[in-house]
A protein has these predicted regions:
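Short flexible/disordered coil segments
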Residues: 1-10, 143-145, 150, 210-219
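TOPRIM metal-binding catalytic domain and adjacent DNA-binding surface shared by DnaG-type primases
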Residues: 2-90, 94-95, 262, 266-275
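Short, flexible coil/linker elements and helix-boundary hinge sites characteristic
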Residues: 11, 79, 119, 150, ...
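Short, solvent-exposed polar/charged micro-motifs at secondary-structure junctions
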Residues: 29, 84-88, 115-117, 231-237
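Phosphate-handling DNA/RNA-contact segment within nucleic-acid enzymes
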Residues: 85-191
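TOPRIM fold recognition
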Residues: 163-275
Length: 275
């Protein structure tokens, strides 16, 4: 008020914005805030599809996927198809706790070369609904193996699960991106097994620790981190893209997320806030 009074006496224009005094410092946590956080609630009205949802697609594996290591028997188990009209690999996603004939949705992955140049989306929803955030891909098919092994490896992409299954490894699941939703965390906790977080190359180690922290200390949790540069830098490849020998090495030398790891995360967070 005093400032406003003095401005009036001197005939000066008075303006004040309460945000003017705030520092315009770069937010050190911006990299994490860029990830869109979504909260998912279980909707009893979410439709569940049966095998008829795949009738318009060809029941054949895509040859380039076979060359990459996704075997026909894996495609058959996960009911992978192909759409000639849309030029997309058809990927149905079974409900994690449903029957073999229950799907929550279908996505199509383009096979068009240089699709970015033509503004063609890499993935496209082929079903009316597809609430990925309330499901964990591959858990329906791999549940028994995961229980027997006592752990599950959480990957990003559906194809990564298919690659591991092609190598006779039924412990992998996929969450669809690099951040677990609250519902996916609840689903994985319910398995009562070790959770191994294995995100793609290039993901910051502190982001990985944040994902591990969602399970700690309720479940034993660990993470795969390539300290040996076995995965090409800048490739954004998944550990599942590596030869089986490399993948097993990374899995064997996974890092247990414990109090020491958690302290590193908290120290980093505090340091970023101070800066």
């Amino acid at each position: 008020k005093a400032n406003k009074y003095l401005h009036n006496i001197l005939g000066l224009k008075y303006s004040y914005n309460k945000n003017d005094n705030k520092d315009n410092k770069k937010d050190p946590l911006a990299i994490f805030k860029k990830v869109k956080r979504q909260r998912y609630t279980i909707d009893k009205d979410v439709p569940v599809y049966d095998n008829s949802c795949m009738k318009e697609y060809t029941d054949l594996p895509y040859i380039d996927w076979v060359r990459e290591g996704v075997m026909p028997f894996a495609c058959k188990r996960f009911n992978i198809g192909y759409s000639y009209d849309r030029k997309r690999i058809v990927i149905p996603e079974r409900k994690w706790d449903g029957d073999d004939n229950e799907y929550i949705g279908i996505s199509g992955r383009t096979t068009v070369p240089n699709y970015e140049m033509f503004d063609i989306p890499k993935f496209f929803k082929l079903s009316k609904s597809y609430p990925k955030g309330i499901n964990v891909y591959g858990l329906n098919e791999n549940y028994q193996t995961i229980q027997e092994a006592g752990y599950t490896v959480v990957l990003e992409a559906q194809k990564s699960v298919l690659k591991r299954y092609s190598r006779k490894d039924g412990t992998a699941v996929a969450i669809g991106n690099c951040e677990l939703t609250e519902e996916q965390v609840r689903i994985l906790i319910s398995l009562n097994v070790e959770i191994v977080v294995a995100l793609d190359e290039g993901i910051d180690i502190n982001h990985i620790r944040q994902e591990c922290d969602k399970f700690y200390p309720i479940r034993k949790v660990s993470y795969i981190y390539d300290r040996w540069d076995l995965i090409k830098k800048g490739s954004k490849d998944s550990p599942a893209d590596m030869p089986n020998k490399v993948y097993n090495f990374l899995l064997k030398h996974r890092v247990l997320y414990d109090e020491s790891e958690r302290r590193k995360l908290k120290d980093w967070q505090e340091k970023q806030v101070k800066n």
